[in-house]
């Protein structure tokens, strides 16, 4: 049985409920039944000794108004919790991962340590993955044990970077455990490809899988393969590249926030979600650029170039099926991605919205 997520986000609802749903008490149902979309086998054998990874330096992240100090001053609680100001002050594994990556590149060991300690004690599951959400208004605050694979990837990447930079073997060990857990619990083999699932539960059933192209954080995946070339990340990278070259739809050949893959290889925008190049998919060109894969960013770049040439604003989303666009402009975070990939000047002030600010700072990274 699959848990189907909502097609639209009601006003006031946490955006990540759109992709996760509350699965508490239903996990046994999710893993039951026969399906041709099967979870990938658990990795076995010893974990190779980590290879040296590049050591981040402060020069590899922005300074001034768009920087880690500015971001942490606005969104980091002293406890180490990154606060999503756009979603009722919740926290999630994604935000913890973004914050930890930023702090590592900025050389802020104290903040990194606080964020990891909060994440470890609050979200870490026994299997090495992270519960995806912390809601201070809920009882208990962590009430959905499902993970968010992009959050796991970001945290594992940050731990690997920081463990190397600050010579912390425990962080490297935890990074390795998270990588193995991702491969064993958050991937699916379908249509002859091994692909990242958005979460362990609720996204693969009956020979189909719902996937999120923006969960391919290329600098992180490359770092995983470099640290542990025997774990299988080369396959994830190769098959993820295939996915992103195929997940192009409509007049402008843009990726959508969510796609559905069938066992025969048919790929389409996820039918139970809006067919938008929007909130999630804007990270596809960002991660492609940061990961040295400009070809994967090209459709978005060409679309944005066309908008500029026509003297039009960059819309918050475009419907790839109808061509309709949002009647409001993209956020400062998207504008920062456009400046990174197309050229031009990015917004000079950090947004007061968590997600837009994340995108702004990420666009300054030079992994």
Locations of regions flagged by a protein language model:
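N-terminal secretory signal peptides
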Residues: 1-30
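Extended ligand-binding clefts on enzyme/binding-domain cores
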Residues: 61-66, 89-93, 149-150, 172-343, ...
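Substrate-binding cleft of extracellular glycoside hydrolase catalytic domains
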Residues: 129-181
């Amino acid at each position: 049985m699959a848990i189907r997520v909502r097609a639209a986000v009601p006003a006031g609802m946490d955006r990540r409920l759109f992709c996760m749903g509350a699965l508490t008490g239903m996990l046994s149902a999710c893993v039951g039944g026969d399906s041709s979309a099967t979870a990938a086998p658990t990795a076995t054998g010893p974990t190779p000794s980590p290879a040296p990874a590049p050591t981040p330096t402060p020069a590899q992240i922005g300074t001034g108004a768009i920087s880690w100090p500015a971001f942490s001053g606005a969104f980091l609680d002293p406890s180490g919790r990154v606060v999503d100001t756009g979603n009722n002050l919740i926290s999630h594994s994604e935000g913890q991962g973004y914050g930890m990556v930023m702090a590592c590149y900025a050389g802020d060991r104290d903040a990194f340590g606080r964020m990891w300690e909060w994440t470890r004690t609050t979200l870490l599951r026994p299997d090495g993955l992270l519960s995806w959400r912390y809601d201070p208004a809920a009882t208990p605050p962590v009430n959905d044990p499902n993970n968010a694979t992009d959050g796991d990837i970001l945290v594992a990447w940050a731990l690997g970077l920081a463990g190397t930079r600050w010579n912390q073997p425990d962080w490297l060990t935890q990074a390795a455990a998270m990588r193995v857990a991702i491969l064993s619990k958050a991937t699916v083999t379908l249509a002859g490809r091994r692909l990242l699932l958005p979460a362990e539960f609720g996204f693969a059933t009956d020979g189909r899988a719902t996937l999120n192209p923006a969960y391919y954080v290329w600098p992180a995946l490359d770092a995983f393969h470099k640290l542990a070339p025997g774990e299988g990340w080369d396959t994830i990278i190769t098959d993820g590249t295939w996915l992103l070259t195929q997940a192009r739809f409509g007049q402008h050949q843009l990726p959508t926030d969510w796609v559905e893959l069938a066992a025969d290889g048919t790929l389409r925008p996820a039918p139970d979600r809006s067919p938008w190049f929007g909130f999630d998919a804007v990270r596809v060109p960002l991660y492609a650029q940061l990961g040295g894969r400009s070809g994967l960013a090209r459709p978005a770049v060409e679309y944005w170039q066309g908008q500029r040439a026509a003297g039009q604003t960059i819309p918050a989303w475009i419907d790839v099926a109808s061509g309709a666009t949002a009647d409001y402009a993209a956020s400062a975070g998207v504008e920062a991605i456009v400046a990174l990939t197309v050229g031009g000047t990015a917004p000079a002030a950090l947004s007061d919205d968590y997600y837009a600010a994340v995108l702004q700072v990420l666009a300054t990274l030079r992994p």
